[in-house]
From Swiss-Prot:
Ranges of biased composition (kind: Basic residues): 1-16
Key words of the record: Ribonucleoprotein, Ribosomal protein
GO molecular function (one): structural constituent of ribosome
Cited HAMAP family: Ribosomal_bL35
Pfam families per record: Ribosomal_L35p
InterPro entries, per database record: Ribosomal_bL35, Ribosomal_bL35-like, Ribosomal_bL35_CS, Ribosomal_bL35_sf
Stretch list, region Disordered: 1-22
Protein name listed in UniProt: Large ribosomal subunit protein bL35
Recorded GO CC terms: cytosolic large ribosomal subunit
NCBIfam families attached to this UniProt entry: rpmI_bact (TIGR00001)
Matching Gene3D superfamilies: 4.10.410.60
Originating organism: Streptococcus suis (strain 05ZYH33)
Length: 66
């Protein structure tokens, strides 16, 4: 049986944390900041964690990611 390959688009969007979790980056951060408040922009800078409901599916796409 062939090896399972890492989904390359997912590998560029998620990073593994030291405790085994997955870090993700937030949406709505590319343009149109004039319509957002300072508080919204500040919170969008921070990375988020992948939720438990999505974790198993995303982890299967990232087989080779360390």
């Amino acid at each position: 049986m062939p090896k399972q390959k890492t989904h390359r688009a997912s590998a560029k969007r998620f990073k593994r944390t030291g405790s085994g979790g997955l870090k993700r980056f937030r949406a709505y951060t590319s343009h149109r900041f004039h319509g957002k408040t300072k508080k919204q922009r500040r919170h969008l800078r921070k990375a988020g964690m992948v939720h438990a409901g999505d974790f198993k599916r995303i982890k299967s796409m990232l087989t080779g990611l360390k």
